[in-house]
From Swiss-Prot:
Keywords, sorted A to Z: Adaptive immunity, Disulfide bond, Immunity, Immunoglobulin
Region (Complementarity-determining-1): 24-34
Additional facts recorded: This chain was isolated from myeloma proteins that bind beta(2-1)-fructofuranosyl moieties (inulin).
Taxonomic path: Eukaryota, Metazoa, Chordata, Craniata, Vertebrata
Gene Ontology BP annotations: adaptive immune response
Name this polypeptide is given: Immunoglobulin kappa variable 11-125
Gene designation: Igkv11-125
């Protein structure tokens, strides 16, 4: 199975900060990767698909990039509403696998 190693598991940042999190695939090429945002009690929301394509309606402060088997989600100019857990999903190789998640908190 392809393992998706996500880091950090949690982070705290201030409003207006630039935040990054990464997922690294343990193996494979041509990995198709999505990023999701999940808030407590809510269904996951697709942010980015194909590693870097922004889903319709998602603010442009979210962006995704890829270098080989390393994938990065960046949030620029952090806002209060961005407090959530973020996770990646690879859906190129069965079984599809998720990263462990990154819990993002806002420093007060």
């Amino acid at each position: 199975d392809v393992q998706m190693i996500q880091s950090p598991s949690s982070l705290s940042a201030s409003l207006g900060d630039i935040v990054t999190m990464t997922c690294q695939a343990s193996q494979g090429t041509s990995i198709n990767l999505n990023w999701f945002q999940q808030k407590p009690g809510k269904a996951p929301k697709l942010l980015i698909y194909g590693a870097s394509i922004l889903e319709d309606g998602v603010p442009s402060r979210f962006s995704g990039s890829r270098y080989g088997t390393d994938f990065t989600l960046t949030i620029s100019s952090l806002e209060d509403e961005d407090m959530a857990t973020y996770f990646c999903l690879q859906h190129s190789y069965l079984p599809y696998t998720f990263g462990g998640g990154t819990k993002l908190e806002i420093k007060r």
